[in-house]
């Protein structure tokens, strides 16, 4: 070989690096242009409680593994604790920026997973770009509290990437990375318990032998079974909203209809429709074709498409964030099917690929338009939260004294009703906290955020009837337009009971030192 001759391996490596950098750049541009404006908005809803939990965990490390109201998602806490060190602990901009970065990183991981499953560099990049610009995936980018969804997907995609291909043996490094990915999945969200099935799909794709599945599936399955047993023991009645109904069989068809733009994705009122059945039939035909043609990666894509939905079948609602992982599996399946079509019908290869490029472009454009509409909805939601934050700042001194404070909700305003009835983007399902002002933010988390003292926590006293019986404190009443400090009272429990008897919602909070 002369000096002018290129090393083929170097060329392949260089092309791979260029492909990765180009994909990362396109994803970065897409996230910045589409989602970036959200960084300047106030936080919304559950985000304040999760940040409050992370605030306490930064001072009390035992809370790093604790649940938040029976939701055991410690990696959510960890990322928020890291945020507190990277950014100002009470600055929404930092938390939002990290969520946007995570959104982009998951899309890049999806491109890597696509390559691992056999997609070409262009197809893998297209899958990642369609995913990152989709309204089915934007809720976790727009709401800081919902990082657990992309964190779970990132862990599963990492597991796919490190799992050896057919003919490749396990190495110490691969084993370590696979264990880390599985532990990361377990730390992200309870849905991780379906991971043994993903492991089975990966190993079957690698070995094509049912007998070979037993060792890895048994190991991960035992870990998942232990997790389930401990979870049921710790939180025996935590998911009281599970129920049987038509939503159980309607959920998957409705998801698929939305993915194919044959119908709307509705977060509630799930019913079986003709569009859903048609979409189910289309996806089944694609999957059967890929399996008959022995397309590598098909079982893995199907696992991502179906598995995340199984633990939530009994949940009678389906918010946007539930769609992010299944949509990744759907896009991978479509990519594998198109690739198989192109290679099987080589006479029509250019036409098939051209059609795929045009379709992907149209889907990205349509998705981006809906994401921008979603952004406007979140802008309205953030503005409503900012009003409450400004009102709370007017009476924060009344809460800062260290005494129990009775917070009375003496209004029935619903500032998000417009978003619920007529959203500009996809239908949304924000959680309403009826006991808290405007139903927006948990009272303790609200005043802890407004107080913004690193060493101070605002506790919520739920058992105030016994804890505050005969205790001196103060009363703050929230009415339309703001809070009113009614001053000191001699018995917080008695005053709270009086307001409750008048059909008012009450909370009792108290500032306590963290250190």
Question: Predicted regions span which residues?
Answer:
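Polytopic membrane enzymes that build or remodel cell-surface glycoconjugates and lipids
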Residues: 2-515
